[in-house]
Amino acid sequence: MLFRSLAIALATRALENGFSVSYYNVDEWMHQLKQDGAVHPMQLKHRKYMASNLLVLDEFGYQSMSREEANLFFRVVSYRYQKGSTIITTNKGIGSWPGVLAGDEVLAGAILDRLLHSATVLNIQGRSYRLKDLESSLANQSQAADKSRGIPLEESRASC
């Protein structure tokens, strides 16, 4: 969630400063790419995902790509290289990208070479905010249940 929130904040700031922005969930975006797959890349330059100053791709690596999808992804990255900015949110480390990109280390290397040239990589580590909220909610429910049964809070904590 933090990744997406940060990406949206950066995209919003870009819009406020007059830049064009396109935001896609990668799985949904792949559907569009497959439809455009037979079109020559130069004819795609007016597509939103090619022409935007900033392209935000959310949830990269949630599902592995087929060879066709990985090649289409390369085509977009290659076309946009040094023409527009791209933000990619992912929970995958760079070392696991070949596995996401149809197991093709050469293709992954070519994509990463273009993406990482002049890039800023934010590696955010820590516990999931969703899980943190769930744990807090479960702890509150447990305390409420103990209270309704008349168990003092100190005794409840001691049993944990």
List each language-model region with its residue ranges.
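Short, small-residue-biased leader/transition segments that mark boundaries at the very start
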Residues: 1-2
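Walker B motif beta-strand of ABC-family P-loop ATPases
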Residues: 54
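Post-Walker A helix-loop "phosphate-sensing" segment adjacent to the P-loop in P-loop NTPases
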Residues: 11-24, 34
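Hydrophobic positions on the alpha1 helix immediately C-terminal to the Walker A/P-loop
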Residues: 6, 10
